[in-house]
Amino acid sequence: MATGRTHRPATRSRGIPEATVARLPLYLRALTALSERSVPTVSSEELATAAGVNSAKLRKDFSYLGSYGTRGVGYDVEYLVYQISRELGLTQDWPVAIVGIGNLGAALANYGGFASRGFRVAALIDADPAMAGTPVAGIAVQHTDDLDRIISDNGVSIGVITTPPGAAQQVCDRLVAAGVTSILNFAPTVLSVPEGVDVRKVDLSIELQILAFHEQRKAGEDSAAEDEGAPPMRATPASRKGPDGDMPAVMPA
């Protein structure tokens, strides 16, 4: 039975920083890969490298979980997978509703990685009447007119918005009114929500802009390196000043 509406992970009450919470999925992904290879233990250095963080930060993060590892042995992989999964609330079923079944919404509905991480796509919702009843990833799309009932019937507390930006706030308001308390927003707009509702924004264009910044910086470094390796330019004779100042008396043809 879905319990997503009532359960809350203990991260806030235990005072785990948000930055640490944001890194826990990175550790879990690396640990899951180790578990699938039947690796029993892992050192903080090895796990930090796999997760893309430094080992001191990893050890500090794990101290919030009460996990310090064993000197000379490292961390028990299976126990850490369980511990982090429990902390993130992934040891239970989280029914999710996706609103906006265009290309992105349909792609998310077809993504097979949700179920293995504790998330079940319970409902697909769209404003287009022509979409109603259309199966996507084996789930029939339902109309937004029935949103309140859909959320209630499926015990949904997590909503995913993949609508055009102009419709996102209205959809957000309706989800919140129906009882949704966590929203993943893919629409390129900022949502306003009441206290107690968590929103995570995914903006692919921003991520691309950040990559463009790094590409530009790397290109600048390469250009500077080429300039440093180039032979010095020979000095050219000073131009003869004309009667009107710095311009030569006779301009080149």
Curated annotation (Swiss-Prot):
Primary residence: cytoplasm
DNA-binding region: 26-65
Domain of life, source organism: Bacteria
Residue ranges, annotated region (Disordered): 217-253
GO function terms (MF aspect): DNA binding; DNA-binding transcription factor activity
InterPro entries per UniProt: CoA-bd (IPR003781), NAD(P)-bd_dom_sf (IPR036291), Rex_DNA-bd_C_dom (IPR009718), Tscrpt_rep_Rex (IPR022876), WH-like_DNA-bd_sf (IPR036388), WH_DNA-bd_sf (IPR036390)
Localisation per UniProt entry: Cytoplasm
Keywords annotated in UniProt: Cytoplasm, DNA-binding, NAD, Repressor, Transcription, Transcription regulation
SUPFAM superfamilies: NAD(P)-binding Rossmann-fold domains (SSF51735), Winged helix' DNA-binding domain (SSF46785)
Entry keyword Cytoplasm: yes
Alphabetized Pfam families for the sequence: CoA_binding, Put_DNA-bind_N
The keyword Transcription regulation is annotated on this UniProt entry: yes
HAMAP family: Rex (MF_01131)
Subunit structure of this chain's protein: Homodimer.
NCBIfam families with a match to the protein in the record: PRK05472.1-3 (NF003989), PRK05472.2-1 (NF003992), PRK05472.2-2 (NF003993), PRK05472.2-3 (NF003994), PRK05472.2-4 (NF003995), PRK05472.2-5 (NF003996)
Protein name: Redox-sensing transcriptional repressor Rex
Lineage, broadest ranks: Bacteria, Bacillati, Actinomycetota, Actinomycetes, Kitasatosporales
Recorded name of the encoding gene: rex
